[in-house]
UniProtKB/Swiss-Prot annotation:
Assigned keywords, A-Z: Cell membrane, Lipoprotein, Membrane, Myristate
A single GO BP: dauer larval development
Species for this entry: Caenorhabditis elegans
Domain of life of the organism encoding this protein: Eukaryota
Intracellular or extracellular location(s): Cell membrane
Encoding gene per record: eak-4
Membrane topology per record: Lipid-anchor
GO cellular component: plasma membrane
Tissue: Expressed in the 2 embryonic head hypodermal cells XXXL/R.
Protein's job: Together with eak-6 and sdf-9, negatively regulates dauer larva formation downstream of the insulin-like receptor daf-2 and in parallel with age-1, pdk-1 and akt-1.
Lipid positions (N-myristoyl glycine): G2
Protein name as annotated: Protein eak-4
Length: 247
């Protein structure tokens, strides 16, 4: 993932936006994808913004100068890739835990809204109704999903337990694929034979990832806290054969 972000930063620093080859990574190939050929500067900048920042409106050159765009871009990269658990908690640990869990619940709730939105698009398609409004609503839900994930990344900065980095990695994997999901949803309204199966697979992954993060948190933090509030990690290592693997 760090290599992907490094590629993006080199693109943003370039004056000419040269042709970028298709990335070889299978895990994050949706993170940066460029069609063959040369983009004009505005299109290239918008393309970079679209894939890295699925929740943000496309930023045009007349709206932001290059330095300001670069500053916002670097700040977002730092939020996504920085290690979790860097900051010591200054208030009651329960406050941080409740905020952390509330954000996780919001991620799951939003992912389920994505599933409902996709179902609405399918029902409109089967009835031969216009799809534009349904597609737009679903794309806006993807934007909201990105914002919630970013809020979770901020909450992950606190050293809540020894697994905040692992859970952030799970969230990061889902976050980086939101742009690919958004494209799949947009294509539903652009083809006579829309590929609902592809969009459904991507939505199901978002739901699965959200459920996995919540389950991991409850098993490694909430249950551990009930067992022994003074030693969460010790309980987890006793209960789980490999606490760093998905449950």
């Amino acid at each position: 993932m760090g290599q992907c972000l490094a590629v993006h930063r080199r693109i943003m620093a370039s004056q000419e936006f040269p042709n970028i080859p298709q990335p070889e990574s299978q895990c994050h190939d949706a993170f940066i994808r460029y069609s063959p050929g040369r983009y004009e500067r505005r299109a290239a900048r918008s393309q970079v913004d679209y894939y890295l920042l699925p929740q943000a409106p496309r930023l045009m050159t007349e709206d932001l100068d290059k330095k300001e765009f670069q500053r916002l871009y670097d700040a977002r990269c730092e939020l996504v890739e920085c290690p979790a658990g860097r900051r010591a908690m200054q208030l009651d640990v329960q406050i941080y835990a409740d905020r952390y869990e509330a954000t996780l619940n919001k991620i799951l709730e939003t992912s389920q809204e994505l599933d409902k939105g996709l179902e609405d698009i399918f029902q409109a398609y089967t009835k031969d109704d216009p799809l534009a409004d349904k597609v737009m609503n679903c794309r806006l839900t993807v934007d909201e999903m990105g914002r919630v994930y970013e809020h979770f990344f901020r909450e992950s900065a606190w050293n809540l337990d020894s697994f905040v980095e692992y859970r952030k990695n799970l969230a990061r994997d889902a976050y980086l694929l939101l742009a690919d999901l958004k494209i799949a949803i947009q294509r539903l309204g652009m083809h006579f034979n829309p590929n609902f199966e592809d969009a459904q697979v991507k939505v199901d992954f978002q739901i699965m990832q959200a459920e996995q993060i919540i389950f991991h948190f409850k098993r490694t933090y909430r249950d551990a806290l009930k067992h022994n509030p003074d030693s969460i990690t010790e309980f987890v290592e006793d209960e789980l054969e490999d606490p760093g693997t998905p449950l």
